[in-house]
A protein has these predicted regions:
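Conserved H-loop
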Residues: 115-120
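Conserved beta-strand-loop-alpha-helix hinge in the C-terminal portion
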Residues: 141-165
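Hydrophobic anchor residue at the start of the ABC signature
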Residues: 75
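ABC ATPase nucleotide-binding domain signature region
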Residues: 1-33
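ABC-family nucleotide-binding domains
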Residues: 89, 95-96
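Helical segment within the ABC ATPase nucleotide-binding domain
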Residues: 100-113
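A short, surface-exposed alpha-helical micro-motif characterized by mixed small hydrophobic
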Residues: 127-129
């Protein structure tokens, strides 16, 4: 309830083709809201999110959704869960620029709703646009923390080389 995880490549790992769109969307609500499988509750979810997601998605089998529609499904499912923290595992893996911008917008939507977003990534540049701080963690815990206002002090010649060093 407190933490949600969005796995790497969530359109392949977090969508269940044997379930319809509404079932995929509401499955995370079942722990938080009783009666989520009742028609009136599902109608309420559709009324609230249909204009944002597009009414057509409720009629399309999930395996035929576009990549963008699948990402919206996953991120909106998490939004409905209302966790305090969302952990995104390599959210930009294999993504082109348009896809990255779309995922940033989806994460900003979570931030706007008051959720904390933790981005686990190998590429630091992937997270800097959203981050308010960078934390380098080693086997013994936190090794270094850099606040947003200090991002400018990070080296551009060899990007963040010091952050990769082991102690």
């Amino acid at each position: 309830k407190e933490i949600a995880i969005i796995a790497a490549e969530p359109t392949k790992t977090m969508i269940f083709n044997e379930m319809n769109y509404m079932d995929n969307l509401c499955m995370g609500l079942s722990r938080r809201v009783s009666g989520v499988w009742k028609r009136n509750m599902r109608d309420s979810v559709r009324k609230e999110y249909g204009p944002v997601l597009g009414e057509e998605v409720f009629q399309i089998p999930v395996e035929r959704l576009s990549e963008r529609q699948k990402y919206q499904l996953v991120y909106t499912r998490v939004l409905l869960q209302k966790p305090k923290v969302v952990v995104c595992v390599q959210p930009f893996k294999g993504a082109d620029l348009d896809h990255r911008v779309f995922v940033w917008k989806m994460m900003e939507m979570l931030l706007d709703k008051g959720m904390s977003v933790v981005i686990l990534t190998i590429n630091l540049a992937d997270s800097m646009s959203l981050a308010d701080r960078l934390i380098r963690i080693g086997k013994d815990g936190i090794l270094e923390e850099v606040n947003r206002e200090d991002f400018g002090s990070l080296s551009i010649a060899a990007p963040w080389l010091s952050l990769y060093r082991t102690q």
